[in-house]
Design a protein with these regions (language model features):
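Flexible, glycine-rich phosphate/dinucleotide-binding loops
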Residues: 12, 35, 83, 90, ...
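Structural motif
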Residues: 40, 72-73, 97, 129-131, ...
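Structural signal for conserved beta-strand scaffold positions within catalytic alpha/beta enzyme cores
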Residues: 5, 28, 76, 97-100, ...
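Cysteine-nucleophile active-site neighborhood
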Residues: 48-120
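Amide-donor transfer/coupling interface in amidating biosynthetic enzymes
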Residues: 105-149
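N-terminal beta1-alpha1 cap of cysteine-dependent amidohydrolase-like domains
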Residues: 1-69, 73, 122
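Residues at the C-termini of beta-strands that transition into short coil/loop
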Residues: 7-9, 30-32, 100, 107, ...
């Protein structure tokens, strides 16, 4: 499987390294036409306002929305999830509106309020050590969104 990692801003290198360590073929995606060569896309964490600005500057928005409507697999972590959301509680950034969720940015407060928590994930036997750093929280989902943890 060939996975693309949107490499405009944020922790794209960490995502790419982890995927490669687990046997995936990985490409860092910097231009919209590179999406034609991958089987799925990860939009990594980083700063959501900056990521959205770069998505628009580099002309990704229409391509990502089109791919999502065609069922192209995408995963967003932290800021990536914010970018994909249908609705935000904040007035910015303007998300892609490709995942039917409502998200509150920085819901866990300031940087000093960051914490770690072991989570149970559907399909994973062992608890997963999750780090919440000024993390967003999903306020609501549509009925067709599957909650994994």
């Amino acid at each position: 499987m060939h996975i693309g990692v949107l490499a405009l801003q944020g922790d794209y290198a960490e995502h790419a390294n982890m995927l490669e360590a687990n046997g995936a073929e990985v490409s860092e995606i910097r231009l919209p036409d590179q999406l034609d060569d991958v089987d799925g896309l990860i939009i990594p964490g980083g700063e959501s306002t900056t990521i959205v600005q770069l998505i628009d500057i580099y002309g990704f928005r229409n391509k990502l929305v089109e791919l999502a409507s065609d069922g192209f697999p995408m995963w967003g972590t932290c800021a990536g999830m914010i970018v994909m959301a249908n609705e935000l509680t904040d007035h910015r950034p303007d998300p892609l509106k490709i995942m039917q969720i409502k998200v509150s940015r920085n819901a866990f407060g300031r940087q000093i309020d960051s914490f770690e928590e072991n989570l149970k994930f559907k399909g994973i036997k062992e608890d997963f050590p999750a780090v919440f750093i000024r993390a967003p929280i999903v306020i609501s989902t549509s009925d067709d969104v599957e909650i994994l943890s």
